[in-house]
Amino acid sequence: MLSLNEIKFPSHWNLVPNEPSYVDYVYREGLDLGVWRPDNQRDRMAHNNVVSLTRFFWPNVDFERLVMGGELMLWFFTFDDGLDAGIYDDQKSVDLVRRMEIVFMDGPEKVAFRLRSRCLEMCGKRRDTFNRFISSCVQWVDSIIPFNKVKDGGSPHIELYSFLRKINIGAYPCVTLTEVMLNHHLEPYIWSDPRWLKMNENIAIVVTLINDLVSYEKEVNDNAGVLNPLYFFQHQNNQNLPDSYRKMVNLIHQYVNDYLHLEEGFLRSMAPFHDALQHQEVHFMLDHLHYLITGSRMWSMQTPRYCSPTSPFIEMRPPSKSYL
């Protein structure tokens, strides 16, 4: 039996999830948008599973900001699951991607209009912040088809996989949305600091690897293991499951250690802070990067999306629950 607790993170990255009342609010928005069918239990469960992730990524924000995070997760689900399911042919998939690019750049459709409008209002004169958020969403949209096509050539090398997946996992829009949530006591040049950009990459890759671990059984059962490192390490390296897991744990720890070194240099480069508000907002952003990792693991241990009585991870198959 494998344990996700073999993956170690700094103790100050631990979190207590935010309150869940926003989930119902975003669900009613989803009904209004036509994302969900009224009185459909399966739709309601799917919504709760996906949107509940927000309270782990943003454990310390207010209701308005939780709603924004929930709307982002709802949009991710609406767009990504359809393409991943393979229900569209190539041309239809390309057309859908182009349509979603326009939705986020110009905001003509309700599916993204509310979130886009909230962000624009919260940013005020910070159009650079708003543009970074929209650009990260468009970048994520553009990554989905290329990543899905990688499997046509078989399992990739882990370096190629990580390079593509760090965009495809969707961490960057979460980070830029968190920048939108700030009250703006920071200079915009911070976000082009090479340390900050590399920190984002490392966090995105760790989130990816955690997601690959918790989704392993589901993806193998869906014949999608070719793009899961826990699966393809076994075949590329002729290893068993425990050895492949240890390889992934070591890889995660390597990225975390590199991140910690970068974060230390990033903070040194900003010292001294101009005031307490600047210090607070920098650490708000850093905490969000931490929570993307620890929140992903914590959420995955309790969501029916991945939990299973036959999961290889002991934390994901509690005997007292039944799963769909």
Swiss-Prot record:
Organism from which the protein derives: Heterostelium pallidum (Cellular slime mold)
Gene Ontology biological process terms in this record: terpene biosynthetic process
Domain notes: Contains several highly conserved motifs that are important for catalytic activity including the aspartate-rich 'DDxx(x)D/E' motif and the 'NDxxSxxxD/E' motif, both of which are involved in complexing metal ions to coordinate the binding of the isoprenyl diphosphate substrate in the active site.
Keyword field: Lyase, Metal-binding
Reactions the enzyme catalyzes: (2E,6E)-farnesyl diphosphate = (2S,3R,6S,9S)-(-)-protoillud-7-ene + diphosphate
EC number(s) per entry: 4.2.3.160
One Pfam match: Terpene_syn_C_2
Protein's name in the database: Terpene synthase 18
One GO MF term attached to the UniProt entry: metal ion binding
Protein's UniProt keywords contain Metal-binding: yes
Residue interval(s) of motif NDxxSxxxD/E motif: 211-219
SUPFAM superfamilies (UniProt xref): Terpenoid synthases (SSF48576)
Lineage per the UniProt record: Eukaryota, Amoebozoa, Evosea, Eumycetozoa, Dictyostelia
Family: Belongs to the terpene synthase family.
Keyword Metal-binding attributed: yes
Function: Terpene synthase that converts its substrate farnesyl diphosphate (FPP) into the sesquiterpene protoillud-7-ene.
Residues spanned by motif DDxx(x)D/E motif: 80-85
